Amino acid sequence: MILVTNDDGYNSYGIRVLYRAAASIAESYIVAPDHGRSATGMSTTYNVPLRAFKFDYGYAISGFPADSVYMARYALYNDKKIDLIVSGINHGDNISLRSLYSSGTIGATMAGALIGIKGIAFSMSYNGISNEKIDLAEPYIKAIIENAMERFPDDVDILNVNFPGNLNRNTRILPARMSYNIFDDNIIKRLDPNGHEYYWFGNKRHERCPENCDYDVVYRKNSISITPITVKGYLDDLRSTEEFISFINVKELLG
């Protein structure tokens, strides 16, 4: 089966289109948050109970996108084999390493990859996004899922797919490297009506991204980007760490 999830909530338009595409290929079910959970990464619920609310073709749950994956795998559909996780279609792109670590859309596929299930995260740029544009993405999504079910790259855990907002029937699909960071951050301090300070976190995008990075493909080339991701975020070569440890003198500190 194909598990369909997202971080915009089970009733978002994007997940409906994604489910429609997935269900045309294989048995598919939705397990997704009961409301928007954007920018929650791989957050997981540990200290409060989770609740699941059944509807025609899946469940809405009270947790995060990653919880949706765990609930599907270990509780709601534990009698079925999940062959692929598809997440989205997110309202807004998910490009750069910032999104890799903060996006709930990608976070759901990361949770799946860590328990051995490959996944695809689908997102669309805010620029020009509409239900009609999301509908236009459906044949592309169907083609990508069909291909993934047959020949998902062995050395890849997740495919991160981003659609331009002004998608059309002639839009190309291009491979893209993930840009390092496309945001310049800032914190704005203000006063509430009672004179107490509060803060807004914000950022602006910059265009310092090399050719063929995800930003370049989506925004400069007006194309669909597909970025391969692996969840292995560590180095096998321990030599530099061994050298670092050699300079730690604990005995001297302990006296």
From Swiss-Prot:
Localization per Swiss-Prot or TrEMBL: Cytoplasm
UniProt key word Hydrolase: yes
Catalytic activity: a ribonucleoside 5'-phosphate + H2O = a ribonucleoside + phosphate
GO cellular component: cytoplasm
EC number annotated for this UniProt entry: 3.1.3.5
Record keywords: Cytoplasm, Hydrolase, Metal-binding, Nucleotide-binding
Cofactor(s) the protein requires to work: a divalent metal cation
Main location, first listed in the record: cytoplasm
Name the record gives this protein: 5'-nucleotidase SurE
Natural source organism: Picrophilus torridus (strain ATCC 700027 / DSM 9790 / JCM 10055 / NBRC 100828 / KAW 2/3)
Gene: surE
